[in-house]
From Swiss-Prot:
One of its GO terms (cellular component) is DNA-directed RNA polymerase complex. It is an enzyme of class 2 (transferase). It holds the Pfam family RNA_pol_Rpb6. Keywords: DNA-directed RNA polymerase, Nucleotidyltransferase, Transcription, Transferase. This is DNA-directed RNA polymerase subunit omega. It comes from Mesorhizobium japonicum (strain LMG 29417 / CECT 9101 / MAFF 303099) (Mesorhizobium loti (strain MAFF 303099)). PANTHER family: DNA-DIRECTED RNA POLYMERASE SUBUNIT OMEGA. One of its GO terms (molecular function) is DNA-directed RNA polymerase activity. The RNAP catalytic core consists of 2 alpha, 1 beta, 1 beta' and 1 omega subunit. When a sigma factor is associated with the core the holoenzyme is formed, which can initiate transcription. It comes from the Bacteria. Disulfide bonds: none annotated. One of its GO terms (biological process) is DNA-templated transcription. Its EC number is 2.7.7.6. The keyword Transcription applies.
Amino acid sequence: MARVTVEDCIDKVDNRFELVLLAGHRARQISQGAQITVPRDNDKNPVIALREIADETLSPDDLKEDLIHSLQKHVEVDEPEADGEVIADQTGAAVAATETDDAEDNITFDRMTEEDLLAGIEGLVPPEKSDDY
């Protein structure tokens, strides 16, 4: 069988660097025991991975999603909070979760003009000089 080259796969995956990442990921999957979708023909795992991409037996988008999923260390899951859960408000006092909705409406923010900010910055004392800098 002819060698699989990047040109055989580049029309399936536009970026050759992404192609290398996807083929490497698929080769690792094959070495871990994943089912191959093309005949082995005494080829090594990276060549099989490239042949699978070239023959479109695997979707590059599916490989990309699988690669991203395999590299994630923490998957954030949105879980609803239980009603009546006790949490702390800004003052540190324990408040039931149902009461915090009303407390959020009463929050006020101080507004500062640019002139007030600059005047406050000018009043700051610069740090002592040291040899660390």
